[in-house]
A protein has these predicted regions:
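Helical "lid/coupling" subdomains associated with nucleotide-phosphate turnover
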Residues: 1-124
Length: 124
């Protein structure tokens, strides 16, 4: 974990303007899964996930819980996708580190991504 944290430190130093960021937006994947687990959402519902605000305390709680569970136990969490059960801990470790280091108290969950932005810009 300390090797990953060192790498994250390096990446954050290289991102222009990262220190001045005021809002953390997390896209899909780990962040959406963490939100679903926090909500207790067994069946995916984009409307409940999109724009959900995950507090740092919730992120750390979900991380601690998942990190102490076996794969089988992780799969019992409402919202945990089978394909994500093996990789979620790494993604959560990154999210926790970024939130702590950058001082974010919450992460805004977005189910939109760069492709949505590209389509919207072409329609404008």
């Amino acid at each position: 974990l300390s090797i990953a944290e060192g790498h994250i430190d390096d990446v954050l130093r290289e991102v222009p303007g990262a220190a001045a960021a005021r809002t953390l937006v997390g896209l899909a994947g780990t962040v959406s899964c963490a939100a679903a687990i926090e909500i207790g959402l067994a069946d995916y519902d984009r409307d409940r996930i999109h724009h959900f605000r995950l507090s740092r305390a919730a992120v750390e709680d979900v991380f601690r819980t998942l990190a102490t569970e076996t794969r089988a136990e992780r799969l019992e969490n409402p919202g945990m996708e089978e394909a994500r059960a093996d990789v979620i801990i790494g993604g959560m470790a990154i999210l926790v580190k970024v939130m702590r280091q950058m001082g974010f108290d919450e992460c805004l969950v977005s189910e939109s991504d760069i492709l949505d932005g590209l389509v919207a810009s072409q329609q404008a």
